[in-house]
């Protein structure tokens, strides 16, 4: 059986109609001679269908197959069960080697050099006139050499075989040698494959336990299911690919057929070599014999070697590697990151028992591997003293806590680019933050799986006498399956996808399209399905230990939640909400019963959604009974009440506290000063009266007395007051005069007295050297300016001008000592208010408050974050 891209069965051979009912054309590989392939039949029909013509070889093959059962009976009667089992085991190993090594070598040379075809041409095996009768031949017509007789015999035998096998209308000499060689090659394939199958079945039959109690159990039920599934795989595969791909036809000639992916080829890569061998494991379950299981594993593994070293190289030479631009997108992103960031190196990745991309100059790599080595050595050296209960708790808590940490990072990164912002604000690059994430994620995987391996190993070691060998091997197979899934996933999505690169470097994505190559052609989320089978394998290995079941459930749930509630919403946001149906989904929905169930579920879902929508409408119906503008009037009344409360002046005609131009401007953008006009009856005025600036939210609880400190945001009403508090009060008092009835003045709050924080504020006039409130101003708003961020130069210009006015800039550097109210936090808030980026205090101190560096850094971060949007 051959393959293309993944298998020939999936590409060139994927013709779902019978070759006899459609006009399929073929051409030879080297000479490009076109022809119409003859009608052929599958292996079973060719050998056992009495309505079809049989050649001599086919009769011999059928006889050899049937004779196996008589030989089995005779050997069993004469030598006993054990000898018979080993006798057929040796036979199976012989035919398996003949299959994978023998046929493999023949196909290897046929693929590279067309050895069989050239041999047939050289010796005129399928010609009317043999070479020894050709005038140009070097052979003498009277030669009696053994070689001549041998090839004449081969010529006559092969021609007789084809004539006795094919219909009368088949013209042997009208077809090119390639098709005739292929027809003869099929005969030997039939012999090897049928003998391989029959000897294996006899060996398994002899290994089945005699006790009915041992046969009728859950293992046998599962085994029968796997066998039936295996039969369906084989039948459906032949339905799709026909004999051409089944017998490696493209090693001899090429069919011109449409590419149709159907049936079993939508479920698994290389289905004939992967799920096509599940029957092996079904029979092993029924036998409950680890020896049968080991033989099955050997047969399956040798088939994968055949695929790797024979079929795949041929397919790549003949059809290319089957990759397209979409499948290479993530790989190109990895290359682009390396190209644009000279200090970037590929991350350390743990794959099974190996580490990839180890960098001897990267400390985190040593830390990761050192952690694994320390844990393993510690477990081995202290195996007798480790309390398994404490170790279980350690594994459980480590997995849960680290998963919560990882999930939180991914969720916040998806929502607000939190992780990237954290590093950008501290002076690092976007790619550097991604590198740190790569270390964190890989370390999380390495740590949790190392602890799981240690715990499972100690569980097996402490209870080895009760461990079932077959369960142990099946568990290891599941571990191998998960390792394979991880490797295939990484191969399909590259390092960029493996480390959730679209969460951190979405600006590197040029094509917003999800890959459907490799394992993602069959499963949408392989990591959620096959990514935990190895953990369930530990359940088998430990004979269904409760603690391992708990850990397996934890692994499964955390995987599911991460994919369902974090990864999938983010993918929809980045690539669009397109429903991608996997190959497995297509095949299952193609089955009528499952399609009907799916339709029923969809209808139920629509009914539930409709009922919820109707309920929501009914619950909102009460609001329609209220006046149309009821809610608007309610909000307006609240605003009026607050305004009335804020104006807390006494009922004296000379009590006044007003902000200049308050009718025009209620929002003061810093560094604009706020000028306050006040008036007080002369009998109430005290030279120690003072005015404080407060946040409304801090003082609204008490209108008669201020119970919070002003924090230095206050001014005297007279230049002669509070002389020991410095000159700033004299500078803020810009005017004061007295008449017979009242005293009035003007106070200006500039950047030396104002808050540098967005909010609603009010002024309070206090009596004497106390906190008794006499007057309260109308609330007003103070806000930080929005600087020009069109270019980094304009942003720097506006920033330096503002800092100069606030008196915190010296020699181009931020110096907070110039204004005690404008500190590092105020600068951070100013930048965030203008450009939406928050730099860390540590970073600004690291660059010595350089306004040029800070402004350009903030602008660069803004550009980076915008590109991620």
From Swiss-Prot:
GO BP annotations, alphabetical order: methylation; phosphatidylcholine biosynthetic process
Recorded catalytic activity of this chain's protein: a 1,2-diacyl-sn-glycero-3-phosphoethanolamine + S-adenosyl-L-methionine = a 1,2-diacyl-sn-glycero-3-phospho-N-methylethanolamine + S-adenosyl-L-homocysteine + H(+)
EC class name: transferase
Parts of the chain that traverse the membrane: 56-76, 87-107, 188-208, 213-233, 259-279, 292-310, 363-383, 390-410, 440-460, 464-484, 535-555
Lumenal side: 2-55, 108-187, 234-258, 311-362, 411-439, 485-534
Membrane topology note: Multi-pass membrane protein
Biological pathway: Phospholipid metabolism; phosphatidylcholine biosynthesis
Pfam families membership: PEMT (PF04191)
Cytoplasmic side: 77-86, 209-212, 280-291, 384-389, 461-463, 556-869
EC number: 2.1.1.17
Top-level taxon of origin: Eukaryota
InterPro entries linked: Phopholipid_MeTrfase, Phosphatid-EA_MeTrfase_fun
Subcellular location per the Swiss-Prot or TrEMBL entry: Endoplasmic reticulum membrane
Gene Ontology CC terms, in alphabetical order: endoplasmic reticulum membrane
One Gene Ontology term of the molecular function aspect: phosphatidylethanolamine N-methyltransferase activity
Keywords: Acetylation, Endoplasmic reticulum, Lipid biosynthesis, Lipid metabolism, Membrane, Methyltransferase, Phospholipid biosynthesis, Phospholipid metabolism, S-adenosyl-L-methionine, Transferase, Transmembrane, Transmembrane helix
Main location: endoplasmic reticulum
UniProt xrefs under PROSITE patterns: SAM_CHO2 (PS51598)
Modified residues (N-acetylserine): 2
PANTHER family (alphabetical): PHOSPHATIDYLETHANOLAMINE N-METHYLTRANSFERASE (PTHR32138:SF0)
Function: Catalyzes the first step of the methylation pathway of phosphatidylcholine biosynthesis, the SAM-dependent methylation of phosphatidylethanolamine (PE) to phosphatidylmonomethylethanolamine (PMME).
Family to which this protein belongs: Belongs to the class VI-like SAM-binding methyltransferase superfamily. CHO2 family.
Protein name (Swiss-Prot/TrEMBL): Phosphatidylethanolamine N-methyltransferase
Organism, scientific name: Saccharomyces cerevisiae (strain JAY291)
Encoding gene (name): CHO2
